[in-house]
């Protein structure tokens, strides 16, 4: 086996919803020699219950008055993700996403994402797993916090 180990820079939502910061983080990761940068895509109104979405989020680190607003402000639009994908190509690094819901998975697949990650909290979300499997692309599945039965 001659496959090289792939190094992934986990950006997640550390960009804080700031497009230019995301680009800076991608470039910094590339300069460190990574093969991939990974972020996260979710639709807060899909992932959260109405109660969770509307819960007051009173924190010095909050990006909104409610938890849902906070999460919305950490998300980029599809157009922004497409621009970030082009930027990744320009700096010669690959980009992929952890997806948390079917809507996000579909959007990222239509955008041409070549690899997907399913986070530990979604390992039992069979509808999401089936959907991402249907894309016929590589999938990384985290299993932290999962029992052997869940996996």
Listing of model-derived features with the role each one plays in the protein:
Residues 7-11, 37-39, 95-98, 114-118, ...:
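Hydrophobic faces of well-ordered beta-strands that scaffold small-molecule active sites
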Residues 44, 124-151:
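Conserved anion-binding
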Residues 1-16, 56, 63-67, 82-83:
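N-terminal small/glycine-rich loop or linker at the start of catalytic domains
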Residues 12-14, 40-44, 100-102, 121, ...:
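Active-site beta-loop-alpha junctions enriched in small/polar residues
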Residues 35-75:
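Glycine-rich, proline-tolerant flexible connector loops at the mouths of alpha/beta enzymes
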Residues 59-126, 134, 148:
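Active-site beta->alpha loop and helix N-cap motifs at the rims of alpha/beta catalytic domains
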Residues 24-43, 111-112:
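Catalytic domains of carbohydrate-active enzymes, especially glycoside hydrolases
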Residues 10, 29, 108, 142:
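Conserved, mostly hydrophobic/aromatic
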């Amino acid at each position: 086996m001659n496959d090289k180990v792939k190094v992934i820079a986990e950006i997640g939502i550390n960009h804080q919803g700031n497009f230019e910061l995301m680009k800076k983080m991608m470039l910094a990761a590339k300069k460190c020699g990574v093969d991939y940068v990974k972020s996260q895509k979710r639709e807060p109104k899909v992932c959260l219950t109405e109660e969770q979405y509307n819960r007051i989020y009173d924190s010095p680190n909050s990006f909104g008055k409610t938890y849902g607003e906070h999460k919305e402000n950490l998300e980029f639009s599809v157009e922004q993700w497409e621009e970030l994908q082009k930027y990744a190509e320009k700096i010669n690094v690959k980009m992929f996403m952890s997806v948390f819901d079917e809507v996000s998975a579909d959007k990222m697949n239509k955008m041409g994402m070549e690899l997907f990650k399913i986070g530990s909290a979604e390992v039992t979300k069979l509808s999401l797993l089936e959907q991402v499997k249907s894309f016929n692309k590589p999938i990384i599945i985290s299993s932290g916090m999962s029992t052997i039965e869940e996996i």
